[in-house]
C-alpha cells in the first residue's frame, strides 16, 4: 500500500484534518496515511522544517510526504512535487521545501493549478492525492508537471559558528516544555574539538555537561542532551524548562527584536 504522511498547521481539533484524509481516501482507498503533526504554528517555518525533517528521515524509501503548511501565504498558482533522497514531497510553493531539505531537491516539478478552481484546502489536497496516484500507477515524475519551474527558496535557520562558540536559536518546544535548539550533535562536536564548554541561556543560566537521559540528574534539575533527532535539548527532569526559564521558540517577529530568551550560546574553553 502507498505510504503517505501528513503535516499541517490545521490544528487537531479542526474537522478539516478528517476531511483531508477522507479526500485522499476517495482518490485511492489503498492509501496508508500517517500523521506527523497537525499542530504546526501558522507561519513558523523553522518549526515546520524541524518537525518534518526529523520525522521524514525515519520513513522507508518512496514514502509520499504531503505538507499542508502555509498553503495560502500567497494566492496559490502551483504546487511543488519533489524527489530527494528517495522520498517524495508535495507542498506549496512557499519556501518551506528547501528549509526541510537544507538544500535544493534532486528533482523538482511544478504542478499548475486550475485557474477556475476555488483554491481551498480540500481542493489542494485533491490535487496532491491525484499526483500520488499517478506516481503509484507508474507514471514518471517528469511527465506529471513542468520541470522548467521557478519556485521560492528559503534557507533553514542555521546556528552562528566561530572558533570558540556557537550561537543557536530555539526552534521547537515540545509538549513537555523541553526546549530544542538548532545545534546538532555533529556541529557541537566539530566546534568543541575535545574542549570543555558552557551552554548559556537566559543570561545567567548555565550547563556544562551533556547528559544521556533525563534520569542522569535529580528531579527538578536542569540538563542538556541531544534528542532522538540529534538536536540540542534543554530540559528539567520532571519539570518545565521553557516555562521556568522563560524561553520561547523562534519567530520572525522575535528575530527582528533580537530578544535574548530565544538564543542559546555554547562557549568552548
Give short role names for the model-derived ranges.
Residues 2-5, 31-34, 63-66, 79-81, ...:
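Structural motif
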Residues 8-10, 36, 68-71, 84-85, ...:
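Fold-independent oxyanion-binding glycine-rich loops
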Residues 75-77, 190-196, 258-262:
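A short, compositionally biased
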Residues 182-255:
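A conserved acidic, glycine/proline-rich C-terminal tail/linker
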Residues 252-269:
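Conserved glycine-rich phosphate/nucleotide-binding loop
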Amino acid at each position: 500500500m502507498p505510504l503517505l504522511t501528513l503535516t499541517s498547521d490545521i490544528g487537531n481539533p479542526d474537522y478539516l484534518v478528517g476531511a483531508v484524509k477522507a479526500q485522499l481516501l476517495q482518490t485511492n482507498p489503498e492509501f496508508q496515511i500517517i500523521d506527523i503533526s497537525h499542530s504546526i504554528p501558522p507561519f513558523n517555518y523553522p518549526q515546520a522544517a524541524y518537525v518534518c525533517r526529523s520525522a521524514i528521515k525515519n520513513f522507508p524509501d518512496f514514502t509520499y510526504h504531503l505538507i499542508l503548511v502555509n498553503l495560502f501565504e500567497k494566492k496559490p498558482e502551483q504546487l511543488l512535487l519533489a524527489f530527494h533522497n528517495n522520498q517524495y514531497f508535495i507542498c506549496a510553493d512557499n519556501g518551506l521545501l528547501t528549509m526541510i531539505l537544507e538544500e535544493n531537491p534532486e528533482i523538482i516539478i511544478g504542478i499548475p493549478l486550475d485557474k477556475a478552481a476555488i483554491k481551498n484546502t480540500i481542493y489542494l489536497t485533491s490535487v496532491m492525492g491525484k499526483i500520488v496516484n499517478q506516481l503509484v500507477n507508474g507514471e514518471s515524475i517528469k511527465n506529471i508537471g513542468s520541470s522548467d519551474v521557478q519556485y521560492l527558496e528559503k534557507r533553514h535557520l542555521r546556528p552562528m559558528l566561530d572558533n570558540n562558540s556557537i550561537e543557536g536559536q530555539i526552534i521547537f518546544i515540545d509538549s513537555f516544555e523541553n526546549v530544542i535548539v538548532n545545534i546538532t550533535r555533529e556541529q557541537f562536536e566539530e566546534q568543541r574539538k575535545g574542549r570543555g564548554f558552557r551552554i548559556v541561556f537566559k543570561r545567567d543560566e548555565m550547563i556544562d555537561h551533556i547528559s544521556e537521559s533525563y534520569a542522569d540528574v535529580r528531579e527538578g534539575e536542569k540538563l542538556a542532551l541531544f534528542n532522538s533527532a540529534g538536536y540540542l535539548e534543554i530540559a528539567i527532569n520532571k519539570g518545565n524548562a521553557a516555562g521556568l526559564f522563560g524561553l520561547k521558540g523562534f519567530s520572525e517577529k522575535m528575530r527582528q527584536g533580537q530578544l535574548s530568551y530565544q538564543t542559546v550560546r555554547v562557549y568552548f574553553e
